[in-house]
Amino acid sequence: MKDLLKFLKQQSKTEEFNGIKIGLASPDLIRSWSFGEVKKPETINYRTFKPEREGLFCARIFGPVKDYECLCGKYKRLKHRGVICEKCGVEVTQTKVRRERMGHIELASPVAHIWFLKSLPSRIGLMLDMTLRDIERVLYFESFVVIEPGMTSLERGQMLTEETYLDALEEYGDEFEAKMGAEAVLELLRAIDLAKEIEQMREELPSINSETRRKKVTKRLKLMEAFYTSGNKPEWMILKVLPVLPPDLRPLVPLDGGRFATSDLNDLYRRVINRNNRLKRLLDLAAPDIIVRNEKRMLQESVDALLDNGRRGRAITGSNKRPLKSLADMIKGKQGRFRQNLLGKRVDYSGRSVITVGPTLRLHQCGLPKKMALELFKPFIYGKLEGRGLATTIKAAKKMVEREVAEVWDVLDEVIREHPVMLNRAPTLHRLGIQAFEPVLIEGKAIQLHPLVCAAYNADFDGDQMAVHVPLTLEAQLEARALMMSTNNILSPANGEPVITPSQDVVLGLYYTSRERINGRGEGMAFMSVAEVEKAYATGAAELHARVKVRITETIIGDTGERTEQRRIVDTTVGRALLSLILPAGLSFDLVNQNMGKKQISKLLNTCYRQLGLKDTVIFADQLMYTGFRFATISGASVGIDDMVIPDEKYTLVADAEAEVLEIQEQFQSGLVTAGERYNKVIDIWASANEKVSKAMMENLSTETVINRDGVEEKQASFNSIYMMADSGARGSAAQIRQLAGMRGLMAKPDGSIIETPITANFREGLNVLQYFISTHGARKGLADTALKTANSGYLTRRLVDVAQDLVVIEDDCGTHEGLTMKPLIEGGDVVEPLRERVLGRVVALDVFYPGTEDVLAPRNTLLDEAWCDKLEEYSIDEVIVRSVISCDTDFGVCAACYGRDLARGHIINHGEAIGVVAAQSIGEPGTQLTMRTFHIGGAASRASAENNVQVKNSGSLKLHNAKHVTNSDGKLVIVSRSSELAVIDELGREKERYKVPYGTVLEKLEEAAVEAGDVIANWDPHTHPIISEVAGSIKFVDMIDGVTMTRQTDELTGLSSIVILDVGQRGTAGKEMRPMIRLLGANGADLMIPGTEVPAQYFLPGSAIVNLEDNAQINVGDALARIPQESSKTRDITGGLPRVADLFEARKPKEPAILAEISGTISFGKETKGKRRLVITPADGGDHYEEMIPKWRNLNVFEGEKVERGEVIADGPEAAHDILRLRGIHNVANYIVNEVQDVYRLQGVKINDKHIEVIIRQMLRKCLITSAGDTDFLEGEQAEVSRVKIANRELIAQGKVPATFERELLGITKASLATESFISAASFQETTRVLTEAAVGGKSDQLRGLKENVIVGRLIPAGTGYAYHKTRNEARAKKNEPVVVNKITASEAEQNLADLLNLAGSQD
């Protein structure tokens, strides 16, 4: 018995650890792990199936094959535990030690570890400062390397071929030493004195000038320091002893028929042992050098294959022509250890089945088939049966359950009561893909799902399957109920809107109920209460849509929460009055007194949640659903072919369009328009025809004419089923109806270009063969796209989760005063996103004042909720500085104040909330809805870019942003600066519209002038770029010589002649160096200056500029001196959809990025080279000037002598995020990425809160580049974690030392994930080999800070409910590094262990 207790004690030891360190194993360490040397390649005896002695499965080394029994059978049973049999040498113990005991192989010759050799950058190569090519030649016995030069002219590490080696031998004899193979490399590595090398390199670093050399030395220094600090020795990168994996981890299983199934590793090990033994024999025999060398090379190759097959040369294949799976392959990739077994596991107590609708369920319920429940809850049922005394033993209970006795069902009901189960539908794209429900037992075999949670699961009932999981422990049940219950997940974590909004039938039913019909039965009746309306409807006195007067009672909840009732008479319909029955007390009847479309219902639920809280909303949502289903049934809405009414005008419209197309075709044939213009015009004609047809069709469908009570004709909204479905938002859209009853319109080819013959037919008329063929293009592309999209979107989500996984809320307030400036988003004349939506749920960073005063409206640290937002709107505040995670100062996490409101709960975020993962899911989940394509600008899209004026939509006053302007002779303003913007401000000072206006725009109104809606306030020529004069005077041509730098062209139509400047490439040699320009002279012939400066007014003319003036002409301020034709900017493909989002998060440089000014100053052009111009910026304060070479074909936005600000655009193009960060700062780059990502999602109608994108940006910005090291341990030019640098700086400042300075760096999400501090997390993401190699060399230790690392080591994650556990552990650890108390073994575990033991002891009697 004492033994038993000892046994139980030994079972409960859990290792307490705070980190995991990885390093290089020294040969002695490997020997210390080992339980014996494996000397023979034999595995098991094929007759007896017993392992061979000293072989790969040897029982003496690795442990017994059967529990508590030695190999020869002399000692059996527990009583001999720990005895080592003297006959066969096997220890009597459990067989599971064969999973943990390792062996080793003593290698006859050292072998390089391929990871440190071949995984780039090669660590051995960096260490020895030799090229990989050279080292490989030494290792694989192709050349010698000098180890000890002695007194010769050779130098250490010099390569010698066979011939040169022999020559050297003749010349020097044995003065020197040169070897080949791994021994040579081993000696070289052993000879390195780390401390000395490091000191030497640190001394020479400052004096190195060449950039590449400096980089190389820094790299080498970092590697050396990593070795030095970690205590690894460089020679350990060469193996002398090879560890052998425990045999149960590389099993060999006899199949029937005398064959064996085996792990590939056994083959690889056998190869190594064979070659090693042969090499030993050859060395004993003192065989010729060449044979030994060959054997050593083969040994090296076989060890390479064992460690990482296929890394060097061709992979070794097995009998089935497949490469063998090496140790490296075991851990990497989707099927590797990390992703297959550590990050995701299969679990028991789960089942799966098809789902069907459960329209009668409550929101927190799901229907569970009895069969499934019986299987899933078996242990609970056994326990209950035994506890009740219905069964005497577990065995008896088992029998009862198998027979399905009547009592079993009663017990099952009891067990299931209030025991939540979790339902999951794959793919689980966000956290709402697993929710908890209370099971309701049902007959049949399908799980029933509540219709309102379908949206969260993205489930439909066309054969979808779902999995059920049973939370077993009390804590698990508690979490399932409190956190995961479907009733607690009403709001979407992505945008804070309700996610349980009704859709489809329910919407249709509610919409139908709330419609009104003119002259319906019972119109004009008046009712004293809603109950009376119900009676009238039930008796048929009034129909559902009749317009009636009703006295309703509303409950009003005051600010303090007291309830008052008030009655009033409203004009409404019978249906709406019935809807008011389910309206919860406290909501106004006006919310349902309207046509209830999907949008309205969503708003109704949202209002309900904000005003009345969770419980009322859940009950109300259920009631809405039941009512919706009921009235949808009553409505009898159905679709017949006659519902698709084709408008009569369609045929005339199509005929007109065809006539126009013919006309253009004729113009084209007579050469008046080009092919491109013709194509664009044709597509335009058809696009507008399509619009007209669909407009006519919608008017036709949406209204019908009826006779009202007075016998007069009146129009009302139609009750056509198709129209109702689309209008309510239940199913279908205007675009789909257009295809049914209008015309299908233009189709695109698979490459995205538009086919110019449209499909004029619609589906009701039917398509002919050609039309059908054209439409198959689109349909197929759609299917292909969907397949690609899913994979791409999944990969994006994976990268996002990986980069953000360790971001958790860890404190209340970091105290920072920084934040992002939020303004309403305005594009052109539309407010795309009002300020309220952008700041709702955020915390104010700096006090917001009442407009025009110093009084504080919203003090710092106010959480802006709905009421506050109303207040801001009331005072027409149009910019607020709010806290953001990007500027949060918390180390290794964020604070609650910088994050603001938890969108899914509606209050400030809790500690321990895993905001990183939520952000990644919120951005990734709608990924499948985004498009995959790149838009080719063709036809309809390209004309948007050729705007030439600004027409305002609102009245107000005009305001200019960063615009320089001059006043021309007509008294109008002409803009002479780039990136100017023009805004319309209303009387309260709120910005209503904002437009970008180019250089050369003529404004019709002065600044601050009042404008009316519809006014055209600015004009410009979209096709040319003018050069505007800023002074008045006479012009003088410089360097403009006809036929050398310019030519004269005469316009055939007008007869006017103009001067065209030649490009440098078109000029003869004489004109190459000349620089054509226009100088402005005053009346006395002296140079004029540009106003306010000492710079003479001279304007350089670039190639292909057109000048319409003659020499010595007089001009005024604001006149155009010349025009540069804008090549209709080459139709660039706009990358849209998913690829665009991925590009932004990966921070990829665009192909031809915009060129931004690196410093502020004055522009001038230096000497040109072939194909490039030299742009020089000279700062005003006389500092160093900046030069950049720019290709000639880039269209520059700047002229000589112009002033630019740092970060201004010099040449147009897509802006690169890295440039924005460098030149305009962190907040600008954050705004840029947020807005660009939001643009893509907005196009698809997906709402995501900005916060989530900011969280990802924070993670992209977590590294920095050290610019000067100060007194820290960092190296200049090193990449370091910002938090680490900040912590180090704080300590230094406290001690009065010099802190390090750094520049923030923007990393793409893949790079950022791989650069994380935790090597476990990085290794499980991508490039496993590289990450592990790097970590091992540096002897890194993983502090298990993030979620992923903790999942991998099998702990609770430091977020959510696991946050408290980690907090107490860390506190205990900090208090005094005492061991944390481990839960002692519980009674039930002891019982279980005992049972196991008895089974073990009893099984071999």
UniProtKB/Swiss-Prot annotation:
Cellular component terms, GO, for this chain's entry?
A: DNA-directed RNA polymerase complex
Source organism of this protein record: Shewanella baltica (strain OS185)
Q: Which GO terms describe its biological process?
A: DNA-templated transcription
Q: What does this protein do?
A: DNA-dependent RNA polymerase catalyzes the transcription of DNA into RNA using the four ribonucleoside triphosphates as substrates.
**Cofactor note text:** Binds 1 Mg(2+) ion per subunit.
Q: Give the enzyme's main class according to its UniProt record, as a single word.
A: transferase
Note the SUPFAM superfamilies from the entry. Answer: beta and beta-prime subunits of DNA dependent RNA-polymerase
Keywords attached to this entry: DNA-directed RNA polymerase, Magnesium, Metal-binding, Nucleotidyltransferase, Transcription, Transferase, Zinc
Q: What is this protein called?
A: DNA-directed RNA polymerase subunit beta'
UniProt cofactor(s): Mg(2+); Zn(2+)
Q: Which gene encodes it?
A: rpoC
Residues that, per the record, bind Mg(2+): D460, D462, D464
Annotated GO molecular function terms are:
DNA binding; DNA-directed RNA polymerase activity; magnesium ion binding; zinc ion binding
Q: Which residues of the sequence carry a binding annotation for Zn(2+) 1?
A: C70, C72, C85, C88
Catalytic activity, reaction form: RNA(n) + a ribonucleoside 5'-triphosphate = RNA(n+1) + diphosphate
Pfam families for this protein: RNA_pol_Rpb1_1, RNA_pol_Rpb1_2, RNA_pol_Rpb1_3, RNA_pol_Rpb1_4, RNA_pol_Rpb1_5
What is the superkingdom listed in this entry's lineage?
Answer: Bacteria
Asked if the record carries the keyword Metal-binding, the reply is yes
Looking up InterPro entries in the UniProt record yields: DNA-dir_RpoC_beta_prime (IPR045867), DNA-dir_RpoC_beta_prime_bact (IPR012754), RNA_pol_asu (IPR000722), RNA_pol_N (IPR006592), RNA_pol_Rpb1_1 (IPR007080), RNA_pol_Rpb1_3 (IPR007066), RNA_pol_Rpb1_3_sf (IPR042102), RNA_pol_Rpb1_4 (IPR007083)
Enzyme Commission number(s) of this protein: 2.7.7.6
Keyword Acyltransferase: yes or no?
no
Recorded hits in HAMAP family, A to Z, give: RNApol_bact_RpoC
Among SMART domains, the record links this protein to: RPOLA_N (SM00663)
